[in-house]
From Swiss-Prot:
PANTHER family: TRNA N6-ADENOSINE THREONYLCARBAMOYLTRANSFERASE (PTHR11735), TRNA N6-ADENOSINE THREONYLCARBAMOYLTRANSFERASE, MITOCHONDRIAL (PTHR11735:SF6). Pfam families: TsaD. It is found in: Cytoplasm. GO terms for cellular component: cytoplasm. Fe cation binds at H113, H117, D310. Its cofactor is Fe(2+). This is tRNA N6-adenosine threonylcarbamoyltransferase. The keyword Plastid does not apply.
Amino acid sequence: MKKDIIILGIESSCDDTSAAVVRNETMLSNVIAGQAVHKAYGGVVPELASRAHQQNIVPVVSEAIKRAGIRKEEIDAIAFTRGPGLLGSLLVGTSFAKGLSLSLGIPMLEVNHLHAHVLANFLREPGEESQHPSFPFLCLLVSGGNSQIILVRSPYDMEVIGQTIDDAAGEAFDKCAKVMGLGYPGGPIVNKLASEGNPDAFRFARPHVSGYDYSFSGLKTSFLYTLRDKLAEDPDFIEKNKADLCASLQHTVIDILMKKLRQAAKDHSIKQVALAGGVSANTGLRDAFHDHARRYGWTVFIPKFAYTTDNAAMVAISGYYKYLQGDFCPIDAVPFSRITV
């Protein structure tokens, strides 16, 4: 096998069109085109998302290849997100990958979006030394659609040992932010306001779920009932207390996440712990990871902010590991909206 492997990654699972190029584990480019159109609707509109992907995919891929400083003929394989995600959005990336694969005569690599988030911890930028978790390690994957504790034995062997049984942590942030009138996406807004508030100002329900599983529906309901009762007494309650509400909400979510992760790490005698997914951009959660590193002797790994949300660099490095295994996919591969780790 040649020494350097160049992989083009394509990500189109939701509302971000992204393309990236990696040489082995080193990122050469990572281009992302977002879709501001969804803010007016308070959430992602699937039809609008797929149309925007069709408009963005060609210029985004072209720009990624240009920034990487390579010719398209140097690409060894194309990695694309097969799922989970919005089917219409996934179809755009999958179809483009097929066309480019046929035109260049190179293989395709189908990537699980959740695997890719985990493997974002293995990305490095030019000039950086490789610093990534040793196997086995635990990864807390938190996003708008997923809250999972994953036991990672290798890039090809991952097991979900705990997951949400209802709402995801990111979904709880978004929905609670929406009822406060804070806008979409709610997670970053809650994070910003939380830094200005008192995390002990309000107490919300904490679930009692067996094992390492999570539940956030009770917390969400408790939050809504608190607002209902307080607004009945004072119509300006949210405006007067939004920083404290956000701080208390964020503190509760993080406490729920970390309690289960602590138990999983203890039970599996693991000290290598990673964070991944869109909610990993939350500064409070990052601080909690560093605090646990000091208190419990963990070695923690947290992706740079650029690799926390959906991006093609994580797809490309996931594809790189598949390339090493010779795990190529047929040209008739189809995307799936729902697949697990």
